Swiss-Prot record:
Its EC number is 6.5.1.1. The active site is at K223 (n6-amp-lysine intermediate). It catalyses: ATP + (deoxyribonucleotide)n-3'-hydroxyl + 5'-phospho-(deoxyribonucleotide)m = (deoxyribonucleotide)n+m + AMP + diphosphate. GO terms for biological process: cell division; DNA biosynthetic process; DNA recombination; DNA repair; lagging strand elongation. This is DNA ligase 1. Belongs to the ATP-dependent DNA ligase family. One of its GO terms (molecular function) is metal ion binding. It comes from Thermofilum pendens (strain DSM 2475 / Hrk 5). The keyword Zinc-finger does not apply. PANTHER family: DNA LIGASE, DNA LIGASE 1/3 FAMILY MEMBER. The keyword Magnesium applies.
Length: 531
């Protein structure tokens, strides 16, 4: 039975070497010594997760509770026999128990469980455990490194391992299958009622760029400002999943109704956007959510919203995965299973620059964000952002995660209101700062954000509160600049929060690679114009 101590030693060993191949070797050899269950848990821990990414359980362990539990380290009797160090599986089971504690007296129960766990760990092991709990940094490797390690130990090609991860949505599940049945890992595919990560789009800055990348003709769709939904239908059931893979079926009855009425099919998994419509016009969904402050209130609010459904892809049909089929085939099959094309995203084929511009302008006039262009030959790549899909928006933003916040002054005194913004570095598995801003939110949002951020507090230094990277915000900016001040090497000029993205996970934010690409493009074209 592998000890948690061994995981920490492997993480430290991987952290000490600089070469990617050597990191992969260390992680591969460590995971290869474990049972499938142990490897599953260890892979998640090394990636900075306790539970699978699609698992909505929360530990509910805050900074103050941890600080109190840490006192047990200073109270260990020196004359007693050292307690048995916990196995990796024991640590996981204890964290499961902590997540399951609720109701009256839950804080005291969680405290006792944490104290019991901390008392069996060394200070170094506690440090690593806290980094897992707070998601402060990935403790051993980025997900990419772990997938390479899994490929090495299983002998399964990296492309197949990556595909399995995108379908299973959990590096732990991939590690389990790699050790239990490597041959089966290469056959993992989309299945009914198991949500997969949605395919994502790169940003384009003008119509000419769409033609340069995708050629003529362009296959364009409206880009809606709604709720990304993945709908699974079959066996007499309908399930709706969010982009974070949460089951939101009960909160969107309109979406379920429109799917049942609009699709004529035995089994299917379709991808689309649910758009809130008030007074016959689309309303920016995230703007509506800004009015609702608490999570349970947001869920009730969702139920009350009238939604229209706009489908744009089908990735599973009557027992067969379609993710390896070209977009042209998937688009045709989607048209064949809808009762009426009203349920489809509005599309066109543009042969000329003028036709593309007119479609873009009609999308914006209709209250939408812009347009999407999709390469006709592209396969569906779950969880992958790339140039096969390009989005052209009427405004330019990036998604950042809040990694720290500062106490405000003057009118904002008493609120955490100056937010440190981070992008994701895929190489290191860390979130790196690109600047900070206090602009864009209302007083009510400052108040609610202060409560949420304090619940996510990891530590406090002076007037800066460092938090678990959990809250995603969409950020406007005027320019990306080179900067030695921030670890990312870049800074956002005149950053302003456009909206809070409750629907996005921290690992969906803009990556450092994407930010670097935007910076290089901005050198060529300082001011963006759709024309």
């Amino acid at each position: 039975m592998a000890l948690f101590r061994e995981l920490v030693e492997a993480a430290e060993a991987a952290g000490r070497v600089s070469g990617r191949k050597e990191k992969v070797r260390i992680l591969s050899e460590f995971l290869g010594r474990l049972s499938p269950e142990e490897a599953s848990i260890a892979a998640r821990f090394l990636a900075g997760h306790v539970f699978p990414e699609y698992d909505n359980r929360e530990l509910g362990v805050g900074y103050s509770l941890v600080r109190e539990a840490l006192k047990v380290l200073d109270q260990k009797p020196l004359f007693l026999v050292e307690p048995q160090p916990p196995a990796i599986t024991e640590v996981y089971r204890l964290l499961e128990r902590i997540a399951g504690v609720s109701g009256e007296g839950s804080r005291e129960k969680k405290l006792k469980l944490l104290e019991g766990l901390f008392s069996r760990l060394s200070r170094k092991e506690v440090e690593y455990l806290l980094r897992i709990l707070f998601g402060e940094v990935r403790i051993g490797a980025s997900t990419g490194l772990l997938l390479e390690a899994i490929s090495r130990l299983s002998g399964v090609p990296y492309g197949d391992v990556l595909h399995a991860y995108m379908v299973l949505s959990d590096v732990g599940d991939v590690a389990f299958k790699a050790l239990e049945s490597p041959a089966a890992l290469g056959k993992v595919d989309v299945s009914l009622f198991h949500p997969v990560k949605p395919m994502l789009a790169d940003m384009a800055y003008n119509v000419d760029e769409l033609f340069q990348e995708h050629g003529s003709p362009l296959h364009l769709e409206y880009k809606y400002d709604g709720l990304r939904v993945q709908i699974h239908m079959g066996r007499g059931k309908v399930r709706v999943f969010s982009r974070r893979l949460s089951d939101i079926t009960e909160y969107v009855p309109d979406v379920v109704e429109r799917a049942v009425e609009g699709l004529h099919v035995e089994e299917a998994v379709v991808d689309g956007e649910a758009v809130a419509v008030i007074g016959g016009a689309p309303v920016p969904f995230q703007e509506l959510l800004r009015r609702v402050r608490r999570k349970n209130e947001r869920e009730d609010f969702l139920k009350s919203l009238p939604f229209e459904l706009h489908l744009f892809d089908v990735i599973y049909l009557n027992g067969k995965s379609l993710v390896r089929e070209p977009y042209s085939t998937r688009s045709r099959l989607l048209r064949e299973i809808v009762v009426s094309e009203e349920i489809l995203a509005k599309k066109t084929v543009a042969y000329t620059r003028q036709e593309a511009l007119e479609f873009y302008e009609s999308a914006v006039r209709s209250g939408n964000e812009g347009v999407m262009s999709k390469r006709h030959s592209s396969v569906y790549k779950p969880g992958i952002r790339g140039s096969d899909w390009l989005k052209l928006k009427s405004f330019d933003t990036i998604d950042c995660v809040i990694i720290a916040a500062e106490w405000g002054h003057g009118r904002r005194s008493g609120w955490l209101s100056d937010y440190h913004l981070g992008v994701y570095d895929e190489e290191s598995g860390r979130f790196l700062s690109v600047g900070k801003t206090f602009k864009g939110l209302s007083d009510a949002e400052f108040e609610e954000m202060t409560k949420r951020l304090l619940q996510l507090k990891v530590r406090e230094e002076g007037y800066v509160v460092y938090v678990k990277p959990e809250i995603v915000v969409e950020v406007d900016y005027s320019e990306i600049q080179r900067s030695k001040r921030y670890p990312s090497g870049f800074a956002l000029r005149f950053a302003r929060i456009r909206r809070i993205r409750f629907d996005k996970s921290p690992y969906e934010v803009t990556t450092l690679r994407e930010l670097r690409e935007r910076y290089l493009r901005s050198i060529r074209a300082k001011r963006w114009s759709p024309q």
